[in-house]
Amino acid sequence: MSVQRNILASLVCFIALNGFAQTADELVAKNLQAKGGVDKIKAIKSVRMTGNFDAGGFKAIVGELSKRPDMVKETFSLQGMTQVQAYDGSSGWQISPFGGRKDPEMLGEDDVRGLSEDADIDGPLVDAQAKGNKIEYLGHDQVDGDDAYKLKVTLKNGDIFYYYLDPDTYIEIQIEKQQLIRGSVRESVTMLGSYKPVNGVMYPFSIESGPKNNPDQRGKITVTKMEANVPVEDSEFKMPAAPSAPPAAKATPK
């Protein structure tokens, strides 16, 4: 009897995962609806997040400010210093005091690419076709021993994301990313949980990310505050001018 029950349970799981929502479009529609619906998602014009970062006892305060269209500013604060990376919709810049560079400087192409993806406030599943993103349904896979729907999302720039959706809620619980950087493939993974509504849209309040094949190098962000539609000027994302050098002292005539 126990064998029959196990077979029946497996069959029910198989039917649940394969008998419904088998197309990419259907899964995306269910995902967006589960997160609040496209109208509510698009009604959010800006988002401010603050959280605690922990990587094996190494702790810091992180923040992210996003605004339509395609602007983002990310901060990492530790021991009285704050690293800043930002994208204003066309170019990216940073202030990196931990590397001894306290003046703003332009970012390289690879860093800008990642920031520009973060700046998509809706994510790659919303208006995917208009953005040039290709979405494929790859069946189901395992996340920590549990079944999940798997979507492959190929961005217009060639970066690839694998979205793993909870079969009950249709919300993403894990995202894997593949990037080709200087001729080599870089893979990372992000695990998402503790979803809460903000202005009617579900956001993860637990975010653990790092190299896909090296769990020891992953860090976890626990969101402490999330605000939507906060007033913010576009100038917040523009690279500030470097401070002017003090005038050279004039030599005193003898």
Residues covered by each model-derived region:
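N-terminal mature ectodomain segment of secretory-pathway/periplasmic proteins
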Residues: 25-100, 134-139
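Bacterial N-terminal signal peptides that target proteins for export
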Residues: 1-9
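N-terminal signal peptide c-region/cleavage motif recognized by signal peptidases
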Residues: 16-18
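Gly/Pro-enriched, hydrophobic low-complexity segments
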Residues: 81, 146-238
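Flexible, processing/modification-adjacent segments and terminal tails
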Residues: 20-33, 40, 91-159, 180-186, ...
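A short, sequence-level motif marking secondary-structure junctions
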Residues: 64-71, 88-91, 110-111, 166-169, ...
